[in-house]
Amino acid sequence: MAGHSQFKNIMHRKGKQDSVRSKMFSKLAREITVAAKAGLPDPTMNARLRLAIQNAKAQSMPKDNIERAVKKASGVDGENYEEVRYEGYGPGGVAVIVEALTDNRNRTASNVRSTFSKAGGALGETGSVSFSFDKVGEITYKASVGDADAVMEAAIEAGAEDVTSDEDGHTIICGFEDMNEVSKALEATLGEAESVKAIWKPQNTVPVDEDKAQSLMKLIETLEDDDDVQNVYSNFEVSEEVMARLSA
């Protein structure tokens, strides 16, 4: 399992999800607004908006918040958010990709650069690390939707490329361009997914020790705490022993 996925599980176990709920809703609302602005404000006619709303619902975002975010896209005085990607290296030479939605590129770039520097890393040029990742679709389901064999069969039928099942749930990987169709096919068989999103999947992972893992987790946590940052991806790998100690 890649380090960032392990980090997400650790944060969940430590109960940090509740403290960042408001921030998470804000990020989900921003994605809904941008998706609605980029196409039609009707989720049945706008695949990106449909998935953004689906992900918001999966996180129990109130219906009023979702509707308000959609309406905000048509507002004359609404903020104009720009999609920006930053790439760099964290401690131990680990590759990191940061996706942001910002109304001020200079502010966001300055904050991201400062965060990398303070963590002992460095921000690079666009393209400096993304060549070692593949952009794919990731569809997740709770473990309760079925056993590994049933989910694997449904995923193959839907046109997915890979499936990972464990006690935390099922993660299905598909081609980025196929994400909308695959998610629809899976929904017909397994029901609505917990999340459907495009991710940067590392082609190879870099093993790190406990000290480096702690530094990287702090870097990721600080980046994700930035209001403009939507997603952070990395290619580090942590052993089960180290993960157990970090989870304690």
Curated annotation (Swiss-Prot):
Example of a GO cellular component annotation carried by this entry: cytosol
Main location: cytoplasm
Family affiliation: Belongs to the TACO1 family.
Keywords: Cytoplasm, DNA-binding, Transcription, Transcription regulation
One BP term from GO: regulation of DNA-templated transcription
GO molecular function: DNA binding
Any Pfam family the entry gives: TACO1_YebC_N
The protein, known as: Probable transcriptional regulatory protein Avi_3631
Compartments, record wording: Cytoplasm
UniProt keyword Coiled coil present: no
Keyword Transport among record annotations: no
Annotated InterPro entries: Integrase-like_N (IPR017856), TACO1_YebC-like_2nd/3rd_dom (IPR048300), TACO1_YebC_N (IPR049083), Transcrip_reg_TACO1-like (IPR002876), Transcrip_reg_TACO1-like_dom3 (IPR026564), YebC-like (IPR029072)
